Amino acid sequence: TRRSSDLTECPVFHLDLNTGKYESVQSLLDTLNEALTAWEQEYGAVEAERNVGLRFKGVVQRAYEKTGQRVAILVDEYDKPLLQNIGNNELQEELRGILRLFYSVLKTQDRYIKFGLLTGVSKFSKLSVFSDLNNLEDISLNRNWASLCGITEEELHSGLKPAVEEMAESNGLTYEETLDRLKEMYDGYHFDRDSIGVYNPFSLLNALKNKQFNDYWFETGTPSFLVEMLKRTNYELNHLAHEEQTSDMLNSIDSVHRN
C-alpha cells in the first residue's frame, strides 16, 4: 500500500467542454482561451504564442520546466463541440480544425506529458480530430480498464456496506434482499467480453443516498446528438430492444459521419 507521502504531485491541466454551447467558432475559442489564460497565470505566458495550439504547447512546457514534473491532461467531453453541430457540416469542419490544432499538443509535447485522459460519448475515426496522433489508446472496451467507470461488487460490499444497511432498514428489507434488488436494477454493465461486471455509479449512488429504488438514469438526460441522429435516420426505436452488435462494429463507429 502506498502512502500519500509517497505520491509525487504534478501539474494538472483540466479542460471541461461539457458546459459550453458551441454555436460558432468563437464560442469554442472562448472556452479554450479561458482555460489557457488560467493555466498561463500559474505557469507564465509568451506573447508570441498567438493561437490556442501554440499557447497550449507553451504552457505545458513551462509547467514542466517550473515544477520538474511531467504534466497530466484531463479533458471532459472532448467531442461536445462536434456533437452539438451534427448536420452543420461547415461549422463542424471549422470546429474540428481548432480541436485538431489543440489536441495535436498531446503528440508534439509528449515528452512533457506523464498522463492524459480524454472522455466523451462518441468514437471518432482516425481521420477526425486525432488524425495527427499515433500515441492515443482507446480503452473504452479494454479489459484492463473494464471496472474504471463503474462500481464493482467488491466495492459495493466493502466501502458502501453501511449505506446498503441503511437503505435496507429504510425499506423494510434484509441486507441480502437489498443487495439483490440493487443488482437487479443497477448492475450488468460490461466493457469487455467476460470482464468484471459493474454497477452504474450515478444510479447506484443516488439510490443509496435517497434510499429509494428508482430509475435514476433518466435524470442524466438524453444526449441531444442521439436525438438528432434518430431524426435523420428515421430509425424505429423498438428495433433496439433486441439488437446486438459485435465489438468490431462498435470500434468502427464514427458518430459525426456525414452520411
Predicted regions and their residues:
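Structural recognition of the conserved hydrophobic beta-strand(s) that form the central parallel beta-sheet
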Residues: H14, A72-D76, G97-L101, K114-V121
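Amphipathic alpha-helical segments of the small helical/lid subdomains adjacent to P-loop NTPase cores
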Residues: S128-S131, I139-A207
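Short glycine-rich substrate-engagement loop in P-loop NTPases that contacts/grips substrate
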Residues: S27, Y43-Q61
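Conserved NTP-binding/hydrolysis module of P-loop NTPases
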Residues: E9-G44
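C-terminal leucine-rich, beta-strand-based interaction scaffolds used for sensing/assembly
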Residues: G172-N259
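Substrate-engagement module of ASCE P-loop NTPases
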Residues: V60-Y64, E93-K114
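Conserved P-loop NTPase "ATPase switch" module shared by AAA+ and STAND
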Residues: T67-Q92
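Short, small-residue-biased leader/transition segments that mark boundaries at the very start
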Residues: T1-S4
